[in-house]
Amino acid sequence: MITAIVLAGGVGKRMGMEIPKQFVMVNEKPIIIYTLESFDRHPKIDQVVVVCKQGWADTMWGYIREFGIKKVKWVISGGSIVQKSINNAVQFLSDKCVEDDIVVIHDGIRPLVDEHVLSDVIVKCQEYGNAVTSLPYNEQIFIKETEKTTNKYIDRNTLRRVSTPQAYKYEVLHDAYDEAISQNIGMVDSAYTNTMMVDLGHTLYFAAGSDKNIKLTTTDDLALFKAYLREKEL
């Protein structure tokens, strides 16, 4: 069984929107539906749980029904930070997944996730027990000496950009969150499952990424998403 956790608990402050950004309409369709359609189409995804901003579950279910999304089985409430939202879903799945099941975690505001990226993260997880979507880092990275100066850089060949989707065997994921919460490791606002896993001593395995798999955080990101959609129509 392969279950996807899709996170849809954002508020959209950086976009200056009055509604959560995952519900912003693009071509008469909310952003979250573009994301869910990718999971609905993928032959290896069996079921989806959406972690939703509190108070928006009815809206989410309304769109799921309107656009014919079949694989979403549950919509649950998120937490105050993304790590608590993921943990809510992991705990919710405790009587719905067995130890060797694969759980794919994805940001709901990455609507351009494609079949190749999803397939590779699943295949790598089946082989190694986990997998994180990644890409080479193509910019130069400098370390601040002061707020105005630098005299050191990091060799970009030693770096990878990691995003979502990420995939983990359920038992390992569940045990990791239990350990992280009990020891207060990797549960801060800037953390995610991948950073928590490394903090707990796990080795992670890279899977294929895509430059199109952007996270819609700003209005510039939204404009880029619309441009990609226009490109697909050509």
Curated annotation (Swiss-Prot):
GO cellular component: cytosol
Gene3D superfamilies in UniProt: Spore Coat Polysaccharide Biosynthesis Protein SpsA, Chain A
E.C. number(s) listed in UniProt: 2.7.7.40
Keyword terms, alphabetized: Cell wall biogenesis/degradation, Nucleotidyltransferase, Teichoic acid biosynthesis, Transferase
One of the GO biological process terms: cell wall organization
Domain of life of the organism encoding this protein: Bacteria
Reactions catalysed according to its record: D-ribitol 5-phosphate + CTP + H(+) = CDP-L-ribitol + diphosphate
GO function terms (MF aspect): D-ribitol-5-phosphate cytidylyltransferase activity
InterPro entries attached to this UniProt entry: IspD/TarI, Nucleotide-diphossugar_trans, TarI
Residues involved in CTP binding: L7, A8, G9, G10, G79, S80, I81, V82, Q83, K84, S85
Family matches, as Pfam families: IspD
Site annotation Positions ribitol 5-phosphate for the nucleophilic attack: residues: R156, K215
Involved pathway(s): Cell wall biogenesis; poly(ribitol phosphate) teichoic acid biosynthesis
SUPFAM superfamilies linked to this entry: Nucleotide-diphospho-sugar transferases
Marked site positions, Transition state stabilizer: R14, K21
UniProt keyword Ribosomal protein present: no
Similarity comment: Belongs to the IspD/TarI cytidylyltransferase family. TarI subfamily.
Function recorded in the entry: Catalyzes the transfer of the cytidylyl group of CTP to D-ribitol 5-phosphate.
Protein name, UniProt field: Ribitol-5-phosphate cytidylyltransferase
Organism this protein belongs to: Lacticaseibacillus paracasei (strain ATCC 334 / BCRC 17002 / CCUG 31169 / CIP 107868 / KCTC 3260 / NRRL B-441) (Lactobacillus paracasei)
Lineage, uppermost ranks: Bacteria, Bacillati, Bacillota, Bacilli, Lactobacillales
Gene, per the UniProt record: tarI
